[in-house]
Regions:
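N-terminal acidic leader/helix
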Residues: 2-27
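Short amphipathic alpha-helical segments, especially helix-boundary/capping motifs
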Residues: 1-6, 35-39
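Amphipathic, hydrophobic secondary-structure cores in small proteins
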Residues: 18, 24-49
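Long, compositionally biased
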Residues: 46-72
Length: 72
C-alpha cells in the first residue's frame, strides 16, 4: 500500500506526463502500468525521484517509455 506522500508523487507524475504527452491521466497511467515503469521505477525509486525537478522527471520517464517501445 502506498503512503500518502508516494501517492501524491505518482499523481504529480501522471499529470506532468499527461500535459507533456497531450494525453489524459488514465492514458498515462495505462502506459506506465503496462510497461512496469510505475511499480518498478517510479514507486520503487520514490526516495530518489521525488528530489528531482519536474522537467528532468518528464524527460527521464519519457525516454524510459520509448526504450520500452512505446511512442509518446
Amino acid at each position: 500500500m502506498l503512503e500518502k506522500k508516494e501517492l501524491t508523487f505518482v499523481v504529480f507524475i501522471l499529470h506532468a506526463l499527461g500535459q507533456h504527452w497531450n494525453m489524459t491521466t488514465p492514458e498515462v497511467y495505462d502506459i506506465l502500468n503496462s510497461t512496469g515503469i510505475l511499480d518498478d521505477y517510479i514507486i520503487k525509486c520514490y526516495d530518489v525521484l521525488h528530489t528531482l525537478g519536474k522537467e528532468y522527471l518528464v524527460e527521464d520517464i519519457t525516454e524510459f517509455v520509448r526504450e520500452k517501445g512505446i511512442e509518446v
